[in-house]
Amino acid sequence: MSIFRALLSSLALLCMAAAPTAFATELLAKADTRMPAATMYEPADIQNVSRVVVRKGERRLYLMDGEDVVRSYRISLGDNPEGHKLYEGDERTPEGDYTLDWRNAESDFYKSIHISYPSERDRELASAWGLNPGGSIMIHGLPNDVGDMAFAYTGLDWTDGCIAVTNEEMDEIWQLVSNGTPISIHP
């Protein structure tokens, strides 16, 4: 009986030790651990960002000068990233053509640039279902209170529908993109 108890105790300890490993494995499975793509130009070399393109399925945001990609960033999206945003609280990132229309240096996240969602069409769709389309969709950095846990956000979809980048990337986007810049968000 004592051998059985020893084996049972060992098994219990092994299971308890494996639980954090299983959790970490689950997080890593959701994360994109690839190295980010090399940037093509130094900030001083970039004369104009004429538009921003987001490809949700690729988890990429591109700063464009005409047809040239001048910057590319790995992004995080809403917790429910597939499909167009339909209503407030659906945790989806909208799809379509919008404008980056204003910015907030003092937001709850490290800097934010507002996307002009909802459009008139977005309002009509939500209204047809008796729903509020939501709003306050932004490109932003990490939460201001993230502290030493910034690494935990990398590669995960964690926003309520916004497009998130690292704080360093947000500094660069903030510098390179002007208010009034068009943004196209694709599936």
What are these regions, as identified by a protein language model?
Residues 1-5:
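Positively charged n-region of N-terminal signal peptides that target proteins for export
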Residues 9-18:
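Bacterial N-terminal signal peptides
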Residues 20-24:
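Sec/Tat signal peptide C-region and signal peptidase I cleavage site
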Residues 25-39:
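A general sequence property marking short-to-moderate contiguous segments
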Residues 35-51, 56-57, 77-101, 121-125, ...:
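N-terminal post-signal-peptidase region of extra-cytosolic proteins
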Residues 41, 94, 102-187:
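Exported/periplasmic cell-wall-interacting domains
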Residues 68-80:
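Short Gly/aromatic-enriched secondary-structure transition segments
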